[in-house]
C-alpha cells in the first residue's frame, strides 16, 4: 500500500514538474477567452447542467422545467399521464410491477396461488444446461455419461473404480 501511494505521489510530482515545459510559457489563444454565443451557449449550458446535478427525480424535473418552460404553462399539479383503470387488475403483478423470475418460480410473489408449479426440465434439457454449468473434466464427463446412459452402469463398471459423486 505504501509503495503504491509513493508511486502515485511521484507520478503527480513528475506531471507538475513537466507541466510548465508542456505549456512553453505561451498564453491561451483568444478563442478560449471569449464566451460562446447563441446556440453554442445553450448546448454548453446543457452539457454542464448534466454534470452539476445528481440524477434523481427532483433534479430531472428541475432540469425539464428549465429546458422546456412552455410545457409547464397552466399545467400545475401532477403531470403524470392518467392511468387506465381497466388495466389495473390485469396480469400477474405486485402493485403494478412485474414479478421477477425468482418470485414466479418459487411461488413467493403476489397472486401466485392459482397457478400450477412450473414443470421440471426434461432430461435432454437438463443435460444441455449441465454442459454450461460444469467445467469439462473427467468427473463431469463421467457424471454426464451416467446420466445419458444409465443402462451401461448396471454391471458395476468392471474395474471397481467407480464411485458415487
UniProtKB/Swiss-Prot annotation:
It comes from the Eukaryota. Residues 1-25 form the signal peptide. Natriuretic peptide that dose-dependently induces the rapid relaxation of rat aortic strips phenylephrine-precontracted. Acts by stimulating cGMP production in a dose-dependent manner (by probably activating NPR1 and/or NPR2). May also show potent hypotensive effects. Pfam families: ANP. One of its GO terms (cellular component) is extracellular region. The lineage of its organism: Eukaryota, Metazoa, Chordata, Craniata, Vertebrata. Residues 56-68, 135-149 have a biased composition (Basic and acidic residues). Residues 56-100, 135-165 are annotated as: Disordered. This is Natriuretic peptide Na-NP. It comes from Naja atra (Chinese cobra).
